[in-house]
Regions:
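Gram-negative and organellar
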Residues: 1-148
Length: 148
């Protein structure tokens, strides 16, 4: 790998009722590039998710903020400025058992379809690193028990 990273994360999940849960997270990471071209940085993260366990689907809506502080000036743009940026991420995910649509294929309802959308907006003190990105994802997952 090109870098060594150490991170710490603290999270708390809270059950409001049978339908609603929340997740709060705080994190810190320190990345050090092996070949040091100014890509050493520290990241501070905070996130909040609210989750809904509806009978017809599981929906999660989240918001996160990440603050990146680089340790060396970026010589590719301006050698006197140390890069610092903040990234705001909004995401929504919907999960549904395939067995709810096709009981013959998944009678135990252990095969899931997941659809998600993520919007990231990053602002830096160096304009070259400002961006807005949208991401869509569709995936399938299978749950199974290792004790059987």
């Amino acid at each position: 790998t090109n870098s060594i990273t150490h991170s710490f994360t603290l999270g708390h999940d809270f059950i409001v009722n049978q339908l609603i849960t929340t997740s709060i997270g705080l994190g810190y990471s320190d990345a050090d590039a092996k070949v040091d071209a100014g890509n050493d940085y520290e990241t501070y993260d905070g996130s909040l998710n609210i989750n809904f366990a509806f009978p017809w689907a599981y929906i999660s809506v989240g918001n996160a903020l990440s603050f990146n502080d680089y340790k060396k000036a970026d010589s590719s743009v301006n050698s006197s400025i140390i890069r610092s940026d903040v990234t705001h991420t909004f995401d929504i995910m919907v999960t549904k058992a395939i067995g709810d649509f096709f009981p013959a294929i998944d009678p135990n309802r252990s095969l899931f379809i997941n659809a998600s959308y993520e919007k990231m907006k990053s602002e830096a003190n160096i304009m070259n690193y400002d961006y807005i990105a949208d991401s869509f994802s569709l995936s399938f997952s299978k749950s199974f028990n290792l004790n059987n």
